[in-house]
Amino acid sequence: MGRRSKSRALSVWMNGERVGDWRRPAAGGQEFLYAESWLSSPAARPISLSLPLRPSREPYRTGVEAFFDNLLPDNRQIRERIQRRFRTASIGAFDLLQEIGRDCVGALQLLPEDHSPVNVKQITGERLTTDGVAELLTRSLGSTFAREESLEDTFRISLAGAQEKTALLFREGVWHRPTHTTPTTHILKLPLGTNPQGIDLSTSVENEWLCSQIVRAYGIEVAQCWMEAFGEHKTLIVERFDRRLASDGTWYLRLPQEDLCQATSTSPGLKYESDGGPGIGDIMELLLGSEQAAKDRRDFMRTQFVCWMLAAIDGHAKNFSVFLLPRGAYKLTPRYDILSAYPVLGHGRGKLSPEKIKMAMAVHGKNRHYRWKEICARHWLETAKRCGFGEMKTIIQDVIARTPAVIQQVRAVVPAGFPAQIADSILGGISTRAEQITVELSG
């Protein structure tokens, strides 16, 4: 059972500076107001492209809930587990984030209105053994506390997405549970298991690791990651690109960023283009305003094409992000959360039909095309043309030319004991796609 919400306002902080206040007025709704001190700070920047700095300090009332909602898992079951664990009034963004908003994606910390972060420029944490990490992962899957664990001692972090995960501090080769305001530096992702449709995704750790190697080999910047086991828990460890050690080595900075649902004021429930979320054209238009627009637009289209080659069909707007720079500037972050459908393609129980699977964002011909198997090179060229982007054919030719070397390079780093079905299906899949595109382009 939930409890009544304790607060009608949370203070929003970034690296020890107060950014503003997130409020629930008595009349209803939500609002966000930038702090006057933040507007005059050398570090000032908006918390979102959808909530620009306002010198007038007029509060925002639209788009506020969508922004903060996107800081949380969009999986209802995970939200309900957080609700039970922290005994919150609801699974709404405000109620959950007042409990777990101390270490969010990006740079934000959410604290009670009358609190401020302490010891920001220090690194503190509780050292963890391998068994300690395993115990923490086990506990993260539960909905209740260990008897000796109090609410005050509980590790409170918020990670968006639909997957079971937690985050820790990794420093000088040792794992720590950060304390006070020290941020986490690495995300630990557990296997997805079997989804509600009966699709076995228990090898998602190996799948995502392999996809990251492939994407990097194609020349795309992607989050660094590795695989590691903690007791019974197979884990993908992802280095956070929204964290950076300060130049003096004494503390970690939180780097401001947001996903493209936040940037476009899109609710996480509408993250897919077919549901009303941003599509390729919307994002290419947004990237025209990037600090490095030409590079970001080129990298985004290259990523889209490579993900299609990979049958990585879940590339919705939450799986792309931008760094937020001073005074409203921004640029694309590295890629992340890329998972191939090749290992589960087929017909029958527990399989995804290749004829039915859809990409998260459509490409264009005479009509919109979502179905993965129907998409051809000409659709990519037409989509790029509509976006005012003239480099798509060069990108396609380069990706196809690189594919044999990419396969060879990635096979060379696949570790012993890696599931052969995962490696063979994904690497074989991109090889087949490359051959098909070669035939189409030469026809």
Positions of predicted regions on the chain:
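Phosphate/dinucleotide-binding and metal-coordinating scaffold of catalytic cores
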Residues: 1-317, 321-443
